[in-house]
């Protein structure tokens, strides 16, 4: 049947710029989905997904990736290359379950559930990793850049503020039940940070790394932009 294919042992599938490897794979051409088990990995331009099992939903024309569901030991990587004077970015997320949506070849949304944590950094400052940790992560992207993040359930976050001359001025540190962060994607900077309390005490502060004695509350506003 040309509409359905299955393969076993050292499976490698190449499809419109996407490479899939696994031990067991199923490809339903009619319904536009791919299911993988056994060390599955999905590689596409600037993105990599891995976990215990992966389910891919293709676009209606079958040429692109619409969404991906990774179940157990989920790991997602996104790398945006440098553009003109703007450095490239590296984002990683981990958790029990990961769901990703794509717009063309760009990641538009990333949702991680249970034991969720992640980080991202700019390629010229790899030692300054911006951290996220909680029960759940819900990240949205614009043109490949992170635009909004919601961290829920014993949420923690750390984000560095980088000046125009590419020196690190300070960092935001936040704790709470839920943390909402809005970014300025074109600047790779935190625009606003809000912390909600509940079962866990909430706090948000900005630490000036140029003057380590200077610490101020940042619960409502993330960076001194």
Give short role names for the model-derived ranges.
Residues 1-225:
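Mature-chain termini and adjacent capping regions
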